[in-house]
Amino acid sequence: MIQMQSMLDAADNSGARSVMCIKVLGGSHRRYAHIGDVIKVTVKEAIPRGKVKKGDVLKAVVVRTRKGVRRPDGSVIRFDRNACVLLNNNTEQPIGTRIFGPVTRELRGDKFMKIVSLAPEVL
């Protein structure tokens, strides 16, 4: 469960190291974001010569949470850290060209198929 002020790792090579959620998109009083939800983030730590810099405000899709996701068969998939993939504000396509770490099957769909195809492992 990601809410405002939550810190996440960037799971791509966009140049951001850590980001902070500043808004959960999708409803006026929506409080929490789960895997597959789009959030608004600001870059808190970035590497030199990256595509994004500290202070940039971007959209991101949540790909891993400590809370996890429950499958219809009753199993739960949890991760050690919260992580997201940064998106272009206009096209909502990933900024980076590589994805680090596993992503879940819940991301499969029309919007995030590119992220699933770039990921090294889909759980």
From Swiss-Prot:
One cellular component term from this protein's GO annotations in UniProt: cytosolic large ribosomal subunit
An annotated GO BP: translation
A Pfam family assignment: Ribosomal_L14
Source taxon at top rank: Bacteria
GO molecular function, one term: structural constituent of ribosome
Function summary: Binds to 23S rRNA. Forms part of two intersubunit bridges in the 70S ribosome.
UniProt xrefs under PANTHER family: 50S/60S RIBOSOMAL PROTEIN L14/L23 (PTHR11761), LARGE RIBOSOMAL SUBUNIT PROTEIN UL14M (PTHR11761:SF3)
Description of how the protein assembles with itself and partners: Part of the 50S ribosomal subunit. Forms a cluster with proteins L3 and L19. In the 70S ribosome, L14 and L19 interact and together make contacts with the 16S rRNA in bridges B5 and B8.
Protein family membership: Belongs to the universal ribosomal protein uL14 family.
Official protein name in the record: Large ribosomal subunit protein uL14
Organism: Vibrio vulnificus (strain YJ016)
